[in-house]
Curated annotation (Swiss-Prot):
Disulfide bonds: none annotated. This is S-adenosylmethionine:tRNA ribosyltransferase-isomerase. Keywords: Cytoplasm, Queuosine biosynthesis, S-adenosyl-L-methionine, Transferase. It is found in: Cytoplasm. The lineage of its organism: Bacteria, Pseudomonadati, Chlorobiota, Chlorobiia, Chlorobiales. Monomer. GO terms for molecular function: S-adenosylmethionine:tRNA ribosyltransferase-isomerase activity. It is an enzyme of class 2 (transferase). Coiled coil: none annotated. It holds the Pfam family Queuosine_synth. The gene is queA. Belongs to the QueA family.
Amino acid sequence: MRTGDFDYELSEEKIAKYPPAERGSTRLLVLNRHSGAVVHASYASLDLFLQPGDLLVLNNTRVLRARLYASKSTGARIELMLLEKHQEEQNRVLYRGKLKKGDKLMAHDQELLVTDIVDHGIARIAVCGERSLSDLFERFGGVPIPPYLKRDAEEVDRERYQTVFAELPGSVAAPTASLNMTSELLDTLRRKGVDMVTLTLHVGLGTFLPVRADALEEHVMHREYYSIPATLVEKIRKVKTTGGRVIAVGTTVTRALEHAGERMETFTGDAPLTGEADIFIYPGYQFRIIDCLLTNFHAPRSTVLMLTAAFAGPDHLRNAYQKALEEGYRFLSYGDSMFIA
């Protein structure tokens, strides 16, 4: 398949630039992946589409302070966003502005060196001193809202670009399918008999970068660390034998479960099942684990859009997106959601 098959026109007014006034007050488009039928609902009514015995899997990662502003000797401001958290001396960053190899930057009296330009808008940065780049971001960094929002982070983002069940720090982007999940909705689902459990996948900004290769087979996928509790593996095995459904809340959960799918079959013990998900899911992929997917409306040419198309079917997803655009749904991280079953 070609990357252009996943392009569509997304105008600025369709992008949700801010979270809704109240968490969970967004819309929900429900798509039947077998028939292509579409139902318009609200996110708060998700319980109507779940059944007793279903297993809801959530990502409990917490977003780091991963956005930092630096300046060049000319005074030009450069925005830096961590692509992943490592304990290395050098880290890859997504940048906005003009940089070249050898440039020196200043960030809060700390000198930085651009050691390499890796790709379009991606550089490798080193700190000229004893402090690590991760430490610098942790001390001075801000909320890493996505670049496509085209604004600086504000106070509202500190709370709303984090899920209500965020626990383990490590992500440089939020698992956005869960941003509208509320404690009240989770309680409603529990009362209905829906089981729920968390895994951890630390999200890198590479998740949201567009695919630049013309042929999907030429795209090199980024890696993201994940940890799946042994209890979740057992719950999945049980659900698969009792007729329940494994419901992935987000593409991050999907990537972790599908990457670990083959190992789950023979996994034993109490230790978590860990790995680095570098799986690239696009149409033609045969899903092993998940039965339903709760996700947002994604950017054109993105790997998360391709994953969603693989699960829903390209034609069904294309039709659903067209209806969502016509009906005024809000797109991307702070926008409305889809439930695909």
